[in-house]
């Protein structure tokens, strides 16, 4: 410490200067270090973003390595609000309830996986909150309905945005009618400091046309720490509406409706090839998620030799059926899926779990599921 300077270095700082390094969640591989600038934060929270417009008292539970830390810290503080830190290593539904009662917490951010888990464990734990922000993954429509019915006075915002766009690129305050949208809960319109482009062959797709979701604006990161080639690939400069525009390519697929609302359709890079067929795991997830007795599910490719894939594996958490009976066992679930899906999409491995694994940032950990297939003979006890 004695060797360190005692005065400010006097380096010039502007909106593009690095402010923090955040890490991606690593749900499908190794976390990447993302360099985020000052304007990425200030443009979002100084721009009248609705959940932070009234000096909220917000739960601050995200680790500082994740951009959720920025949301929970600067969101309230730059708007005259307060941060409340929970005691203990893990946030539990009872802790959230206690913080609302004791410390006046009125706003909280939970990943979709944690939001679902809290609703399953204790649907009343959100009592006293005026606003809940969630997202990062596809929301469960039945759980959203449960929240809206039990907490009609509370706002529920679905936020979408990779770490590379600093917290959110779009957001939508969910309304009951959103639960009836065929493609799932919409992910909204751009938040302050961001623009969204749905591109097909690097051209803007029209309303209702599927394309890759790309983001531009002040919210973009400078790039990946010490990885210039990846930065160049994921943050290209394209000509959009006649202007050269730096964008972040999310790899997600979606479309904008006639009102400009963005709808998420899935990942564009999860496609795998199995026995000559190109397969979208999300198609299987959507079919399983629509069945009575399936609470959560995830589909991952079964690792084969030489980086090939031998088939699909479905992991799910069972729920009670509408008539109160137990949810399907793996064999019954696979039989049902076989009546709904083409043969090459029917998972060869089906496993029931009490809970699906989560990363440190609270998102579904697909890598852990794949690793479990590598650790054990995936034919033992499976279909």
Model-predicted regions and their roles:
Residues 3-205, 212-221, 247-248, 271-272, ...:
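Motif- and composition-driven signal specific to adenylation
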């Amino acid at each position: 410490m004695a060797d360190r300077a005692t005065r400010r270095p006097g380096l010039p700082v502007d909106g593009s200067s690095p402010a923090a390094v955040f890490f991606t969640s690593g749900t499908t591989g190794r976390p990447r270090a993302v360099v985020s600038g000052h304007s990425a934060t200030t443009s979002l929270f100084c721009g009248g973003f609705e959940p932070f417009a009234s000096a909220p008292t917000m739960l601050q539970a995200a680790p500082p390595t994740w951009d959720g830390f920025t949301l929970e810290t600067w969101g309230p503080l730059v708007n005259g609000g307060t941060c409340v830190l929970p005691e203990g290593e893990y946030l539990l539904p009872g802790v959230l309830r206690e913080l609302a009662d004791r410390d006046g917490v009125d706003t909280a951010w939970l990943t979709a996986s944690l939001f679902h888990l809290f609703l399953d464990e204790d649907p009343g734990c959100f009592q006293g909150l005026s606003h809940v922000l969630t997202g990062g993954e596809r929301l469960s429509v039945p759980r959203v309905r449960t929240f809206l019915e039990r907490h009609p006075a509370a706002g529920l915002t679905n936020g979408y945005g990779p770490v590379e766009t600093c917290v959110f690129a779009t957001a939508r305050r969910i309304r009951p009618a959103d639960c009836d949208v065929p493609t799932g809960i919409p992910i909204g319109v751009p938040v302050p400091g961001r623009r969204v482009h749905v591109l097909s062959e690097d051209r803007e797709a029209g309303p209702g046309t599927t394309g890759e979701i790309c983001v531009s604006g002040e919210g973009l990161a400078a790039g990946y720490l010490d990885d210039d080639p990846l930065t160049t690939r994921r943050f290209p400069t394209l000509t959009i509406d006649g202007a050269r525009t730096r964008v972040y390519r999310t790899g997600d697929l979606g479309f904008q409706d006639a009102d400009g609302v963005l709808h998420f359709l899935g990942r564009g890079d999860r496609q795998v090839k199995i026995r000559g067929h190109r397969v979208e795991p999300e198609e299987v997830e959507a079919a399983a998620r629509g069945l009575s007795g399936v609470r959560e599910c995830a589909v991952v490719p079964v690792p084969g030799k030489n980086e090939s894939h031998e088939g699909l594996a479905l992991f799910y958490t069972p729920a009670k059926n509408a008539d109160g009976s137990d949810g399907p066992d793996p064999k019954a679930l696979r039989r049902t899926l076989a009546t709904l899906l083409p043969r090459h999409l029917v998972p060869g491995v089906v496993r029931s779990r009490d809970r699906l694994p989560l990363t440190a940032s609270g998102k579904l950990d697909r890598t852990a599921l794949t690793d479990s297939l590598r650790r054990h003979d995936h034919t033992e006890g499976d279909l």
